[in-house]
Amino acid sequence: MRFVSWNVNGIRAVLKKNFLEVFDAFDADIFAIQETKCQVGQVELDLPGYHQYWSAAEKKGYSGTAVFTREESLRVLHGLGNEYLDAEGRIVACEFPQFWFVNAYTPNSQMELARIDHRLSLIHI
């Protein structure tokens, strides 16, 4: 299996550049993106042969993750049960018969580790 993970720093911006060409070139079984910065349904991707699982932040234009899979997932989780972090759309977890695939976009610690506690809270769930 081929897995690809890419922090796109805004899906709408990268769609104007080369996202679809890169997506096709990797020919991945599972393709995960982080920092989509869009609401669910705001961007429609035509990815024949792929199932799409999106998780968006409540705050518009902030964080967000998505997973595109050839095989349909048995179950999809959009978060890990922590209301504060789940509201930021940082997790898409897909269950398959033999494994779980977890796409996580961890919070930035910022300069001088000002937000390290926020970042670690995701790890300690």
Task: Locate each region found by the language model.
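Conserved small/polar residues in nucleotide/adenosyl-binding loops
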Residues: 123-125
